[in-house]
Amino acid sequence: MHQSITIHATENGKFALAKPCELEKLNPKELLLYSTALCAGMTVQAIAEKERVKLLKLEIKMSGELDTEKVEGKSKFESFNIAYNIECKHIDEQPKVSHAVQLATDKYCGGLAMLRKIAPVSHSMSIVSVEVEA
């Protein structure tokens, strides 16, 4: 069974669920995906800030495949995928954003490191630049 959660950064730098939903209504498997997406998002934000890159949009979809037909207590994840959709201001910022995502995914996000011990984790990213004239 496929489970997924999507979060996005808000104006104040916090994260919110993409679909209007309360955290209390998420099942434990979705909560695991949510916490990992949150960890990755906060890590990407911190690295981008150190690189002096302002992210105009940051959306993260975290998904996983369960080994059962429905969500059960005994259900185990067989694989995970994290997809980043990011907007930055200038095209020359794209390499820095890509590097921030790579570092967060491969090195600094503890949530993803823990999931790698459970099942394989793949990732993808889409980075779009929006040239804004003054």
Model features per residue range: what roles?
Residues 1-35, 42-134:
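Extended beta-strand/beta-hairpin segments
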